[in-house]
Amino acid sequence: MKKKVLVAMSGGVDSSVAAAILKEEGYEVYGATMQIWQNECGEELITGKSCCSIYAVDDARKVANILDIPYYVFNMKDDFRKIVIDYFIDEYIKGRTPNPCIMCNRKIKFELFLKKAIAIGMDYIATGHYAIIEYDSSLNRYLLKRSKAKEKDQTYVLYNMTQEMLSKTLFPLGRFSKDEVRKLAEKFKLPVAKKPDSQEICFIPDNNYGKFIEKETGIREDGVYVDTEGNILGKSKAYYNYTIGQRKGLGISTGKRMYVVAIKPEENKVVLGEEGKIFADALIATDLNFIPFDKLESEIEVTAKIRYTAKEAKAKIVPMENNKVLVKFYEKQRAITPGQSVVFYNNDIVVGGGIIEKALV
């Protein structure tokens, strides 16, 4: 009997090819798109760039018709609002810089979507992520590994996956490059073969976080820039418009290159300093998830990434109380940012990760 798999289809080339590959491999494939966001007028996003626009549903439906697979649309707007949007806004209001894609993967795609899939009789879910899942019989655990195409690897945003999620998820694209995926799309005669990748956060198509937060919260009071001694340097926009390490768009001249070194939301202050002030060699992370084991019992050596685009750096992670770890880097890291995720690797294996609570100088 064929195993049933529900593919999360965004209307893009990756998830479309994932569905085509699984059908070719003999699975009983179903497709579904999660409608997760609408604008303040109650209308679906209409920008063609967004993975949750009305065009995304149209493109996904066209692909499903070509592949001759059943197709569903799940209304998950309320869940997305409560779980992702509110979290995103709350973190910025706290003076932190969140990664909403990680929260969406953790709570929407691999938790709620998986629950829906199991409820309608599916054996697995699948997505178009570039990552590899393998079962290690010696550990009796599923492992998450980097994709073959290192430049497309998406394991950074998947470190929160549990053993249950990994056991029920398929990543058909893990062993392909992006060019190979586009060629497969042409082979399968899919209309999205040349569709560009989405770049922005899906619910902020213009990439203007500050404008979005102001509109959602009504908080618009200007703040002040101060130096590391507390001296006022000038007027700033509301503090939530800034992130640690930022230099562009400050709109202030001090005669020196200045960077955001700290954010004080309770005082509506943005602390500026010279570049040396944004380097640190340690951090504390919380809200941890480990994949090859349940809990870190002793200090281990890893490589670590402090943001999606960062280079990995050698580090030690040391267990602390209250589900926290101390991460000690061998070299100072630029702009360690509270709210972002730090993800740990052992060669190609994802060890786990957590949310950065604070940097330690």
UniProtKB/Swiss-Prot annotation:
Pfam families: tRNA_Me_trans, tRNA_Me_trans_C, tRNA_Me_trans_M. The record marks 129, 340 as: Interaction with tRNA. Keywords: ATP-binding, Cytoplasm, Disulfide bond, Nucleotide-binding, RNA-binding, Transferase, tRNA processing, tRNA-binding. SUPFAM superfamilies: Adenine nucleotide alpha hydrolases-like (SSF52402). The active site is at 104 (nucleophile), 202 (cysteine persulfide intermediate). It is found in: Cytoplasm. Disulfide bonds join 104-202. Residues 152-154, 307-308 are annotated as: Interaction with tRNA. ATP binds at residues 8-15, 34, 128. One of its GO terms (molecular function) is tRNA-uridine 2-sulfurtransferase activity. GO terms for cellular component: cytoplasm. It is an enzyme of class 2 (transferase). This is tRNA-specific 2-thiouridylase MnmA.
